[in-house]
C-alpha cells in the first residue's frame, strides 16, 4: 500500500518526501547565510538612519502602535538619498549572489543520490526548523521539514511493514509519538532508551513517530497531522483497533490541535484514539517565550535599540505559540503574534479518551528550582491547571504524575517516567 503523503501547506505545491540530499542541504544553508546577511544589513541601515536623525533616546507612545501593526517591521523608516541607495545596492548584490549560487547547485540536487539520514544532521535541521521553520517554508528552503510519519528513522512504508510482519501479524494498535520544539523523531532516542520502542515491545504496539517543522504554527501542524493520520488508518494493512498518542512538550499541543481539527473535518481516526499522554506539555504556555516577548517590548522603547528587535522577531510562529499554548488558528489570527494577550478559545480534552499528564521539577521538592518546573515548563502548565475554569483541563488526580529532579528532556529517558507510562498504558 502507498505511504501516506504529507499534505502541503496552504498556497504551497505538494512536496514529496525524500531522503537527505547533501546538495539540498548546501542550497538550504546558503539561502540561510544570504538571508542572514541581508537581515544584518537591514539592521545596520536602520541603526544608521536613527543616528543620522538624532532621534530622542526614548520613543513616544506611537512607537508601540507601529510595532504592533506588523510582525516584521520595527516601525523605523528606511534610509533615503545616497545612503539608501548604498544599502539597497548591498541588498541587491547579496540577493544576486545567493540566487546565482542556488541556480548553479540546483541541477545537481536531483542528479545526486540522496544520502542516509543521521541523528546529528537531523538534530541540526530540526533545531533550525524550530527557530526559523516558518521562514524556511515561506522562502521555499529545502531544509524546511514536511510533516511525515516515520519508523526506524525512515519514512513509514506500509507495504514493507505488511510484508515484514506477515509471519507475526501486523499490530492492530498503534503508538503515535509526537516530538517537541526543535526536535525530530531521533530525539526520542535518549541515553539508550526510546519510550516508543520499549512500550511497543512490552504492550504489542506499533510505534510510529511524527516528524514535523516545529517552527510552524501549532494549528498548521495539527491540521497536517490530522490529515496524515486519516490516510494512515485508511492504508494500514489490517483494520486498526486503537491509537495511543504520546506527546512530548509542543508535541502534546500538536496532538490536541490535530484531534480538534480532525473532528471538525469529519475524520474517523479520532474514534480510534483511546489514550492520550502528555509529557511536559505547556498547555498554558512557557515562561521563556514570555520572557522573550518582554525583552522585545523593552528593546522597542529606544529608537537606538529598536532595530535589534528584528533579532527577537526571529522567533518562529511555533515558538510564539508557546507563550500561551495556542492550539487553533483563531488563537493567533487577526493580530501581531509578538504583541497579544491570552485570547485562546477554550479547548476541552477529547471526550471518551483517557488523558494523562506528566510534569516534573528540575530540582528537589521545595527547592527554589522547583518553582520553574522542569526548567522549561511550569508544573501547573504541564498538568493543565488554570485559574480560569474554562481553560482548566480537569485531568483527574489519578491521571497526573509529578516527578522531581527530572529536566524537561530527561522526561524522554527517566526510568520512573517510563514505569508510569507502562502502568497507565497497560491493559487493566
Where are the language model's segments positioned?
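Flexible, membrane-associating and regulatory peripheral segments of lipid-active enzymes
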Residues: 2-209, 415-419, 423-428
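Gly/Ala-rich beta-loop-alpha elbow adjacent to hydrolase catalytic centers
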Residues: 246-255
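Residue in the alpha/beta-hydrolase core beta-strand immediately N-terminal to the catalytic nucleophile
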Residues: 242-244, 257, 275-277
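Short coil/turn segments at secondary-structure boundaries
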Residues: 188-191, 220-223, 259-260, 290-291
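Glycine-rich His-Gly loop
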Residues: 178-183, 248, 281, 360
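Glycine- and acidic
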Residues: 206-214, 403-404
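Helical cap/lid subdomain of alpha/beta-hydrolase-fold lipid enzymes
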Residues: 119, 125, 260-428
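Alpha/beta-hydrolase active-site loop
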Residues: 216-235
